[in-house]
Amino acid sequence: MSKFNRIHLVVLDSVGIGAAPDADKFFNAGVADTDSDTLGHISETAGLSVPNMAKIGLGNISRPIPLKTVPTEDNPTGYVTKLEEVSLGKDTMTGHWEIMGLNITEPFDTFWNGFPEEILTKIEEFSGRKIIREANKPYSGTAVIDDFGPRQMETGELIVYTSADPVLQIAAHEDIIPVEELYKICEYARSITLERPALLGRIIARPYVGEPGNFTRTANRHDYAVSPFQDTVLNKLADAGVPTYAVGKINDIFNGSGITNDMGHNKSNSHGIDTLIKTLQLPEFTKGFSFTNLVDFDANFGHRRDPEGYRDCLHEFDNRLPEIIANMKEDDLLLITADHGNDPTYAGTDHTREYIPLLAYSASFTGNGLIPQGHFADISATVAENFGVDTAMIGESFLGHLK
């Protein structure tokens, strides 16, 4: 019998809690990630008031310097720790795949200076369309169409760009390049980025509409991902008949592998929380696992190095945390964590190699305190033990520490 009938894992994308032991091997604009500290620096420079996460024990997590504006709790309502990454990457897919039990020893490729000419030329030859070279770099998806959409409308060229993650994105105005044509181009791009030197996690079709100054991306986005290289705990749950629910970009990250119910993309963190709450309320969801990603912290504020915006985004989540808890059942378990860091006060614009926080809460808890410090995959090992399935490659369960 399961200790918890339902477990809900919420990933606050990029909310790291201090430099990892191997941060000296990861860099931002030539600066090692050794002094990165997403939560610590936001608390220090912008102020951080997250009373609901503090109540669970966020401020009790072991750190060299306590979080400046997040108090410790003498009697927290949950259990907390921080977790270390073992995989050789600090991107979204690597973090999520490791959380679900995989050790990624061959990291995906990222392209901070844009994609090499060889790839661009192949896409041009296949599509019969030129590529706007100036867009070929890490770019905000809305900014890139604002900057190059007018030119695309005039010339029919492709907008090819990337991000901090191992992705190749192609934006196209639906009136200029039909969606089906864009999909064919993306399928081709997927076929040429499955091995080094361009091993990419996802190719993303990004259609948009509108006029210069008023472009909007449409719901016709399509992701061409790769599945995890071996079964994760998601697969083991699904194979055992345990329902799995994906909220936000989780389904894309795992290419649908091990997901039995995709609840759709999030338009924003707030929309994602709404979707999670609707998922919690589903009458058929009496047992199983929900997995939510809230990406605004990372996409809107971490990469843009905006500590005040990041702080406000954390406040928004914390304000809504009681709503999530109110829709849980007594024998539910809530796990709140991250997938990497993205210190908005740091050099560069890339993710940062950090520990991730872990907060565990259940109305059924009679105890509280610290979980032994471990690794990302301990989360999936705990989920696996609870539902009576095998772990994946790595991970040690902390289920026995939750009283």
Swiss-Prot record:
Pathway: Carbohydrate degradation; 2-deoxy-D-ribose 1-phosphate degradation; D-glyceraldehyde 3-phosphate and acetaldehyde from 2-deoxy-alpha-D-ribose 1-phosphate: step 1/2
Compartment annotation: Cytoplasm
Matching Pfam families: Metalloenzyme
UniProt EC number: 5.4.2.7
Keyword Manganese: yes
Sequence positions that bind Mn(2+) 2: 298, 303, 351
Amino-acid positions noted as binding Mn(2+) 1 in the UniProt annotation, renumbered to this chain: 13, 339-340
Cofactor remark from the record: Binds 2 manganese ions.
Annotated InterPro entries: Alkaline_phosphatase_core_sf, DeoB, Metalloenzyme, Phosphopentomutase_DeoB_cap_sf
Cofactor requirement: Mn(2+)
UniProt keyword list: Cytoplasm, Isomerase, Manganese, Metal-binding
GO cellular component: cytosol
Chemical reaction(s) catalysed: 2-deoxy-alpha-D-ribose 1-phosphate = 2-deoxy-D-ribose 5-phosphate; alpha-D-ribose 1-phosphate = D-ribose 5-phosphate
GO terms, molecular function: magnesium ion binding; manganese ion binding; phosphopentomutase activity
GO biological process: 2-deoxyribose 1-phosphate catabolic process; 5-phosphoribose 1-diphosphate biosynthetic process; metabolic compound salvage; nucleotide metabolic process
SUPFAM superfamilies documented for this protein: Alkaline phosphatase-like (SSF53649), DeoB insert domain-like (SSF143856)
Purpose: Isomerase that catalyzes the conversion of deoxy-ribose 1-phosphate (dRib-1-P) and ribose 1-phosphate (Rib-1-P) to deoxy-ribose 5-phosphate (dRib-5-P) and ribose 5-phosphate (Rib-5-P), respectively.
UniProt similarity note: Belongs to the phosphopentomutase family.
Name of this protein: Phosphopentomutase
Species in which this protein is naturally found: Streptococcus pyogenes serotype M2 (strain MGAS10270)
Organism classification: Bacteria, Bacillati, Bacillota, Bacilli, Lactobacillales
